[in-house]
Amino acid sequence: MELKATAGSAANLRLLAGEYLQLAIAQADLVQDAYDQTGIFADEEESRGFGAVAALYTETCQVVVRADSDIQSIEDLHGRTVSIGAEKSGSEQNARQILSAYGLNDKMVSMVNLNYEDAAAQLKAGRWMPSL
């Protein structure tokens, strides 16, 4: 078996569906969405045709801000710019779910699609504060 680096869970499921991978690691919620063709997989007819092998671990989601930030809670993200992960990624879906759970939508939070590396660079440079 050959190991390949990918963009994450959503990419892994798309690569698996396209038969570019034989085994993939993915977030459980995205596996379910791909199978049900909901969430970020709602418009993707080729997202099925796989089975689960094993559950690996419970995933922790982290919200990161600069040490000098006045943000102390998710509610403090109102009116801020937030990196929610790469477009159509598991990170984007989870970020939107978290913000929604706190009553925040794209009219209340400016959501930016950046991958981890770009979001970290922007955060470090102080261009905007939070990364979800």
Language-model features: where?
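A structural signal for short loop-to-beta-strand junctions that line the ligand-binding cleft
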Residues: 43-56, 61
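Short, flexible segments with low predicted structural confidence
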Residues: 35, 48, 93-95
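Bilobed "Venus flytrap"/periplasmic-binding protein-like clamshell domains
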Residues: 1-2, 55, 59-125
